[in-house]
Amino acid sequence: MFLKHLTLQNFRSYEELSLDFNSRLIFFVGDNGEGKTNLLEAICMLSWLKSFRESEDSNLIRWGSENYFLRGKIKGDQKESVLEVGFTAKPTVKRKLKFNQEEVKKRTDLIGKFITVLLTPMDLKIIEGGPAERRKFIDAFISSFDPFYLECLLEYNKILKHRNALLKTGISDASHLSIWDRKLIEKGVLILNKRKEIVFGLNSFYQPNLNKLSGGKDELEMIYGPNVKDKDEFVEKLGRNLGKDLRLGYTSVGIHRDDLFIGADKRDITEFGSQGQKRSTVIALKAATFNYYRNVLDTMPVLLIDDVIRELDVKRREYFVDLVINAGQAFFTTTDLEGIQDYVGKLKDQKQIFLIQQGNIQFAK
């Protein structure tokens, strides 16, 4: 995939901006706070239909405005397509999605139209944030290419919310929960099986990636840890934990309690891992998603690299450059282009460099 054009209106710090991209490697260069990451965020919005930094659409609107608009022209499989995302906060909250000028009603209809892989310092949350962040990582990855999975996940969360609301009322008749239990199990088992499949597939790329990054020194396993192993155990645990759930006022078992273990000798990486090991692990994970898109799904995603190269040591930088060499289009943000020139200089492709200062963008090369 290749992003050829990007338009922003009233998005974050940008009132109006239109950029054309004709190179494989694009650099946004500027000091912190100048709006570099806002551009990657806009690209992510076209891909994920949500921000990687902000949960509320209204907070993405430029100060003093009531709406934002994004448009991207994407080339893939010899065809060009146009994605549009718009959001209005006043007088009524409304979001509008378009694909090739036609309005799209369901978010799931846009899945797979524009795929990106983002690498950012915030990725360390996957390692340090515990089970919730690791589930979020796996769910976001699967949802990026599997609309049925996303629909199951959204439905599961709705059912879980209904069941928890009933539990909080302190109902005495378990039959009132039975319909929600059946639905929870039905959707939960579908999610469980897909997570198992994808984690197994990612592992085949994650382990070699980690070996390259660490020189074979870090033997850190990635193991899917389901809260329930199958449908029968889900049924049994829900029944056995009913009393506990009534006391707690929420559902204590299910796929919403799953974990993705990363560590060694049954010890999680958060208990012993150095910052270098954590960085290697998260890069190996993110690179594994890129490998999966490319080798399993036969899709070349666009790489978005948010000021992470300078944080890496020599060996990790060399691996990073190898990843970019084997990628398609890649967007970088950096405060210091000269500081990473020794590494990106090895990339012989034509580059586009945009200098960002006080909200203004100047094409430098």
UniProtKB/Swiss-Prot annotation:
Domain of life assignment: Bacteria
Location of the protein in the cell: Cytoplasm
Family according to the record: Belongs to the RecF family.
Gene Ontology annotations for the cellular component aspect, listed alphabetically: cytoplasm
Protein role: The RecF protein is involved in DNA metabolism; it is required for DNA replication and normal SOS inducibility. RecF binds preferentially to single-stranded, linear DNA. It also seems to bind ATP.
Residues engaged in binding ATP: G30, D31, N32, G33, E34, G35, K36, T37
Listed transmembrane segments: none
A Pfam family reported for this protein in Swiss-Prot or TrEMBL: SMC_N
Molecular function, one GO term: ATP binding
N-terminal signal peptide: none
UniProt keyword Lyase present: no
Gene Ontology BP annotations: DNA replication; DNA synthesis involved in DNA repair; double-strand break repair; SOS response
Name of this chain's protein: DNA replication and repair protein RecF
Key words of the record: ATP-binding, Cytoplasm, DNA damage, DNA repair, DNA replication, DNA-binding, Nucleotide-binding, SOS response
Principal localisation: cytoplasm
